[in-house]
């Protein structure tokens, strides 16, 4: 989609197309270079901003984005945990006219960082929400984020979803300034398996 958008822009606005090529290059560079499983919140938001700039060129005035981030909020987030939620809101959060309004909010709540993505679309289908919580969902993006959050922070700390015909809000909470960054449970199991094999 990004390349198709840039191709269309090339004909009408070559200078803008060059800017988008640089943005796309930056987007992929971040994806390749950020091999850590935890990133700073600001690094994660920068990656999301690159993605949104490309989508803005595609949807133009039909895409409105609001960003509300509490000042001096310091925390680590799982790498690329936010982008799938934003992408889902952009792709599926259009209203009946095709307009898309996406709100990204990050605030401290009860000693945690609450990160949410909201849209004004027509709601997430009930079967998608049920599938997410039962582990039988077909949606890859939300399901992967839900599983990653539970793997890192525990079974009770996955995605939360509020949805209606007036829009949806998907959110999660993570610790502020953790003294020790948690290791995903699947990585712990892999390390234990390796240690057991090395003792034989």
Describe the residue ranges of each PLM region.
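Two-component histidine phosphotransfer core
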Residues: 1-162, 166-171
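C-terminal end segment of the histidine kinase catalytic
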Residues: 163-200
């Amino acid at each position: 989609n990004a390349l198709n958008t840039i191709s269309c822009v090339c004909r009408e606005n070559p200078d803008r197309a060059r800017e988008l090529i640089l943005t796309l290059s930056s987007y992929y560079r971040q994806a390749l270079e950020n091999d850590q499983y935890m990133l700073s919140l600001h690094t994660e938001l920068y990656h999301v901003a690159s993605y949104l700039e490309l989508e803005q060129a595609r949807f133009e005035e039909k895409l409105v984005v609001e960003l509300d981030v509490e000042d001096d909020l310091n925390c680590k987030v799982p790498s690329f945990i936010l982008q799938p939620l934003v992408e889902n809101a952009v792709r599926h959060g259009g209203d009946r006219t095709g307009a898309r309004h996406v709100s990204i909010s990050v605030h401290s709540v009860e000693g945690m960082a609450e990160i949410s993505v909201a849209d004004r679309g027509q709601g997430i289908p009930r079967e998608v929400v049920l599938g997410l919580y039962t582990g039988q969902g077909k949606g890859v993006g939300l399901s992967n984020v839900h599983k990653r959050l539970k793997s890192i922070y525990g079974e009770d700390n996955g995605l939360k979803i509020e949805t209606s015909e007036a829009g949806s809000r998907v959110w999660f909470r993570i610790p502020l300034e953790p003294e020790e960054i948690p290791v995903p449970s699947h990585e712990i199991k892999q390390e234990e398996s390796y240690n057991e094999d090395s003792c034989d």
